[in-house]
Amino acid sequence: ETGCYVYLTGEPENKQKCIVENFDGKKGKIKLRIGNLERNAHYEFQPFARNRVGETIGTAIKYDTSDAITLNETGELTQLMGNHLYEYTQLSIAGTLNGEDLSCMRMMMGRDNNNASTPGKLSDIDLTDVHLAAGGMVGPYHHEAAENQIVQGTFAGCEKLTHVVLPADATTIEKDAFADCTSLREIEIPASAGSILPSSGCTALEALTVSPANANYKSQDGVLLNAEGNKIVWFPMGKKGKYTLPSAFTSIGAYAFKECSIEAFYLSDNVKTLGQGAFMDSQIKEIHLGAGIKLIPTGVFQGCRKLTKVYLGANTEQISNYAFDGSPLTDLYVSASMIPFCEENAFANKVEDFFATCVLHVPAGMKKMYQNHKIWGKFTHIVEE
């Protein structure tokens, strides 16, 4: 067996033993959960390993606990906090919480259940040792708290929240559980989570991290993926710069990158399908589509107010209605050997003089065909590559 001995500094005679469960004997990082520590105390941890031959004890590591709060009963968080309700900026909580406790936590974060402001300033919360119980309303949507679930609206509108570690036994994160948490940068997801839906309005969110022990999800570069790594579950809106889709991806779902902050996308030839509105209202400036994509779906780049350059894949066959509506394209590159079919409103655009300001780039020898086309011929400037 392996684990560590835990004791208060200066009191090694009172040490307790914490054992790693289901230890397989392999080398590498090992995670060990240690509970029931005193607040604001000085501890030492001594790693050990034991077999039939004997025991090896490593050098002690010192650790200072913080002002963690432990609940013995549901509904008592408000009482425990007392006059200190609005003083915390960082907090760890242990115990069982219901809707009443979560509502108190919202107050500490600066919002009540009607989204009215409070003096709270809590921004960093660790709920690892929390068990979520059913009962009691929480959040501006007034949903009832549920067992092991972060229900819709639980933290909605908590603009001061920057970082949250979810309960170790939480199984569900409902849609918009963190809606409009505009300062939230990171969410840590436990191994137990099996159902996750994204939240809108998390404009600063840069990373969703997942326990390596989670069998349903994984995180890559801060992006939440399914376990197979070929589908985006939640793309953080605050992630910036360039993004190259992992080669395992074969499709991008509807609205997958809606409102995201990535400025340049590169899609491999493995991507075969794009969902409707996949990049709608995003901050994208440039995108390179791979040869695997044949259909440009409805509204895929609608509302992309910074999008100026689009490179269509070599096998593009069809462009659907309103694909670029509201996008101020300056250059559209078409490399297909056959002229793609366009629906009647494929290039309908709120941008004034779209056909005059966007340069259409076509393969060598095909300029005349595009100029004589009913829809493609509307472009004032057509150049051969």
What do these predicted regions represent?
Residues L80, D101-M108, N345-A346:
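A short acidic, amphipathic alpha-helical/loop segment
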Residues A68-Y88, R106:
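Acidic Gly/Asp/Thr-rich repetitive segments characteristic of extracellular carbohydrate-active
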